[in-house]
Amino acid sequence: MTEFKVVHTICPYCGTGCGIDLVVKDGKVVDSHPFKRHPVNEGKVCIKGNYCYEFVHSEDRLTKPLIKKNGEFIEATWDEALDLIAGKLKQYSPDEVAFFSCARGTNEESYALQKFARTVLKTNNVDHCARIUHAPTVVGLGECFGSGAMTNSITDLAQADVLLIYGSNTFEAHPLIARSIVKAKENGTKIIAIDPRTTHTAKMADLHLKLIPGSNIDLINTITNIIIQEGMADEEFIKNRTEGYDELKDVVSKYTLEKTAELSGIPAETILEAARMYGSAENASIMYCLGVTEYTFGVDNVKSCCNLAMVTGNLGRPGTGVNPLRGQNNVQGACDMGALPNVFPGYQKVGEAYERLENLWETADLNREIGLTSPEVLHKAGEQVKFLHIVGEDPMVADADINHVEKALKSLDFFVVQDIFLTETAKLADVVLPAACWAEKDGTFTNSERRVQRIRKAVDAPGDALPDWLIVRKLAEKMGAGEKLNFESASEIFDEMAKVIPQYAGMSFERLGIDGLQWPCKTPEDPGTPILHKEKFLRPNGLGKFTPVEHKDADELIDEEYPLILTTGRIIFHYNSGTMTRRCDSITNEIDENFIEINTEDAKELGIKPGEKVRVSSRRGTVNADARVTENVIKGVVYMSFHFLEEATNKLTNSAYDPVSKTAELKICAVKVEKI
């Protein structure tokens, strides 16, 4: 007899956190539908969410542990694989091992992995892919406001009088958040877009500031200066709720309209109009994404946004705030869980909170030194770092300068990958562990607006695959430390998380229900916090901190040999390394190969016609792509996505990183384009 059931869960792709219902027939997921009354997506879904189930039962799912022998993978039992890993781990010191957690996995899994690293192996060398996207957000917002997360809720963006959309192609990267832009437009909201490309999002704007990549700080400082000079600053807010304003005024006063217009390529009158539009609004909201963070000055870019919002008093109310759109489904949660080298769960600093964590975890001698970030691990691989365990990340496609990544991974003494497919990264591993995907386990995700939501198991994992948290628990048992991770379920882990993480203290699986809760939620009666910083900031003194920032050049500038700026981003059909979306036939039928957007004038000068194959080269590598000749990119700039491993864009990109966040400069490098 045929059996059907419908399981409510959360989409596994971007940080929007859309509610979906999985349709299960005879133990297989056969369809998905948007959840009609979900508070985020309200019964709508994008193409990725609509077909998210299609990869679940792919024939190439990992089903058994694999051990590499003589260059070939051999199927193994869990005991064989975990005994081998545990034996290797016992050979290394805390400084010689490192772990990359997974922003695709659940909160419970990131919590378990970082706890294993810290309590069993005494290392803080724990990181995840926020490092290559929104680590500058965590640092910048944290320093200025006291919390490195979206200040407002997705739905209240539509209440803004002005939306400043900065470095975000929301309609393709976060399509259901883009519905708030549509609603805002219908409500009469004025929209300012800052982007070197004429994206679908920019086409909605009343003003489009087509900046030359690298002129970011100059532009925002100039807008801030105009607002101050023309008397649009909120003096009462500044006086009562901030500190450091005089220093900010001194710095931004040097950024003139004329100089910035020349540097940015934006007409002076357009910059002036944008400043007046934002500065005069009663409620103005800044939305930004990786076009702000993925620079060697990404932290300073974020701080400049904070300065602008505080100068105008646009915080603590609906339709205001500084709102980073987080990339992956649980990148916010992985940060919250302490899958970072400098903080324990709940952003408790490793050098300050160790006694509290030692008491809660019933352990001794937690490492008090800040660990290595993922770029630092790769730079020190084979030297200081001997052992690396990666859970659910594919840096061989997703990271900058993947030739450098490959060299680093091959130099390790021992390398473990835990994933649902044999990815490009997993192919280099000594041991590969088969994991359950999101539809095959229980747990929670935390979306971009700090909403903690339950995911629910719909089907069994294939073969011997296990949830990531259970794999980590079994490894702890092999290390003789099973009591450190003595969990029987995801809900048990969540209960411990609520004791450890102040922002989650009032939450439980039962309280999350269907709608979830937005942190901070500190007591069982607390309804959660849709808007941060209403009466005071989360810094110790309750004040927002102005942090003046100055222009910095990109690490790599154009020259005669490499005369074009390459910038990268997402397209609506695929996600990140394409590991999941490119196994969804309904999506790959739309597009399944890489392309490059090039300005009409640049194409004419190079003799390139639409649809022709071109060779794109940087100082690090070369790839081929189909040319899309268009006015959607400004002259001197080309654009590529990074979803296609066959002609991987990240062979070209630059691994130079922000000195504070260690985030690579994926948004700007120098290239040349040649007709093949």
From Swiss-Prot:
Residue sites binding [4Fe-4S] cluster per the record: 11, 14, 18, 46
Keywords: 4Fe-4S, Iron, Iron-sulfur, Metal-binding, Molybdenum, Oxidoreductase, Selenocysteine, Zinc
Boundaries of every 4Fe-4S Mo/W bis-MGD-type domain copy: 4-60
Domain of life: Archaea
Disruption phenotype: Deletion of the gene does not affect growth on formate and H(2) production is only slightly reduced. The fdhA1-fdhA2 double mutant is unable to utilize formate for either growth or H(2) production.
GO cellular component terms attached to this protein's record: membrane
GO biological process: formate metabolic process; respiratory electron transport chain
Record's catalysed reaction(s): oxidized coenzyme F420-(gamma-L-Glu)(n) + formate + 2 H(+) = reduced coenzyme F420-(gamma-L-Glu)(n) + CO2
Induction or repression: Expression is induced by formate limitation.
Record's signal peptide: none
Pfam families registered for this protein in UniProt: Molybdop_Fe4S4, Molybdopterin, Molydop_binding
Example of a GO MF term: molybdopterin cofactor binding
Gene3D superfamilies noted in UniProt: 2.40.40.20, 3.40.50.740, ADC-like domains, Dimethylsulfoxide Reductase, domain 2
Enzyme Commission designation: 1.17.98.3
Cofactor: [4Fe-4S] cluster; Mo-bis(molybdopterin guanine dinucleotide); Zn(2+)
Free-text remark on how the cofactor is bound: Binds 1 [4Fe-4S] cluster.
Function: Catalyzes the oxidation of formate to carbon dioxide, with coenzyme F420 as the electron acceptor. In vitro can also use methyl viologen as electron acceptor.
Protein family membership: Belongs to the prokaryotic molybdopterin-containing oxidoreductase family.
Further details from the record: The genome of M.maripaludis harbors two sets of genes encoding the F420-dependent formate dehydrogenase (Fdh), fdhA1-fdhB1 (Fdh1 isozyme) and fdhA2-fdhB2 (Fdh2 isozyme). The Fdh1 isozyme is the primary Fdh and the Fdh2 isozyme may not play a major role.
Record-linked NCBIfam families: Fdh-alpha (TIGR01591)
Quaternary data: Dimer of an alpha (FdhA2) and a beta (FdhB2) subunit.
Cited PANTHER family: FORMATE DEHYDROGENASE H, RESPIRATORY NITRATE REDUCTASE
Name recorded for this polypeptide: F420-dependent formate dehydrogenase 2 subunit alpha
Species for this entry: Methanococcus maripaludis (strain DSM 14266 / JCM 13030 / NBRC 101832 / S2 / LL)
Lineage per the UniProt record: Archaea, Methanobacteriati, Methanobacteriota, Methanomada group, Methanococci
Name of the gene: fdhA2
